Each structure stands twice: as structure tokens, then as C-alpha cells.
């Protein structure tokens, strides 16, 4: 079981589409299909029911999904912990704000951050409802 296949599995499960998963992963749809087929063969189970263009998780797929999230999370935590031993502070910072605050108020405040934040993700507070449950918001600032 390799990480590329797990990422493809999660992307298909979240989007419900091999094509959309490919777009998310910057892969072609056949490349995503190949990764899923390899994972299914390795695990000897079908992970998705394919009904025309519709894709649904099988019982095995539903059992694998939370475990796949945990595997990737543990790997990321391990990488972060090892980097932190070197004094590098890293990780993802996700801020959910209103449109105006995210565009106009936060950038000047966040520019002089104490640690170099390599990956910013700006999203509107209203879009949080659409996130899969595994994602979380690091901070949701309020301005008065």
C-alpha cells in the first residue's frame, strides 16, 4: 500500500469522481483509476461501486477511509515532529474569515509571522460547511 494510492483513494472518496480526483491530484483520470485498481488488487477488495459516472464507496471503502486519513495524518505528524527537532516550525495554518477580512485585513497582520509559513490557505468562512469532516480550521479570527 503506497501513499500515492491512498491519496488517490481519498480524493475519489471525497469528490465522488475519478476525473475530479485527477484534477485535484494533477493526474489524468486513467492514472487515478490505475492507482485505485492497484490498491484494490493489493487489498483484495473492491473499494468503489462504479455506476456509470457515479462512484460510491463499498463497505470495504467505508472501512478504509478513516484509516487512510489516520495513516496520512500520522505520517504528516511524524514529518513535522522530526523537522521540529531541527528547530524548524512547520505545519498548516488554515484561517477561516469573512471575504473582506481575508482579503484586506489579515494579509498585513500575518506578514510578520514569527515562523516562516510556507503554505497559506485562504478560505471563506461560508465554505467551511462544505469541507469533509477530517479537515479543521486552525483559527477563525473575529474583528471588533
Curated annotation (Swiss-Prot):
Key word Transcription regulation present in the record? yes
Q: Which UniProt keyword terms apply here?
A: DNA-binding, Transcription, Transcription regulation
Provide the HTH lysR-type domain boundaries.
1-58
Mind listing where the DNA-binding region sits, in residue ranges?
18-38
Keyword Nucleotidyltransferase in the entry? The reply is: no
- Show the InterPro entries listed in the entry: Tscrpt_reg_HTH_LysR (IPR000847), WH-like_DNA-bd_sf (IPR036388), WH_DNA-bd_sf (IPR036390)
Gene Ontology MF term list: DNA-binding transcription factor activity; transcription cis-regulatory region binding
Top-rank lineage group of the source organism:
Bacteria
The record, for Pfam families, names:
HTH_1
Family as reported in the entry's similarity comment: Belongs to the LysR transcriptional regulatory family.
Q: What is this protein called?
A: Uncharacterized HTH-type transcriptional regulator in ibpB-leuC intergenic region
Amino acid at each position: 500500500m503506497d501513499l500515492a494510492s491512498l491519496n488517490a483513494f481519498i480524493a475519489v472518496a471525497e469528490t465522488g469522481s475519478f476525473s475530479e480526483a485527477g484534477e485535484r491530484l494533477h493526474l489524468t483520470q486513467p492514472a487515478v483509476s490505475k492507482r485505485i485498481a492497484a490498491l484494490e488488487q493489493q487489498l483484495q477488495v473492491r473499494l468503489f461501486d462504479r455506476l456509470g459516472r457515479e462512484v460510491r464507496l463499498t463497505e470495504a471503502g467505508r472501512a478504509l477511509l478513516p484509516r487512510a486519513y489516520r495513516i496520512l495524518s500520522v505520517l504528516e505528524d511524524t514529518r513535522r515532529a522530526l523537522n521540529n527537532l531541527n528547530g524548524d516550525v512547520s505545519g498548516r495554518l488554515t484561517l477561516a474569515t469573512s471575504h473582506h477580512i481575508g482579503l484586506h485585513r489579515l494579509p498585513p497582520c500575518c506578514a510578520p509571522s514569527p515562523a516562516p509559513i510556507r503554505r497559506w490557505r485562504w478560505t471563506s468562512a461560508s465554505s467551511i460547511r462544505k469541507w469533509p469532516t477530517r479537515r479543521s480550521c486552525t483559527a477563525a479570527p473575529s474583528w471588533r
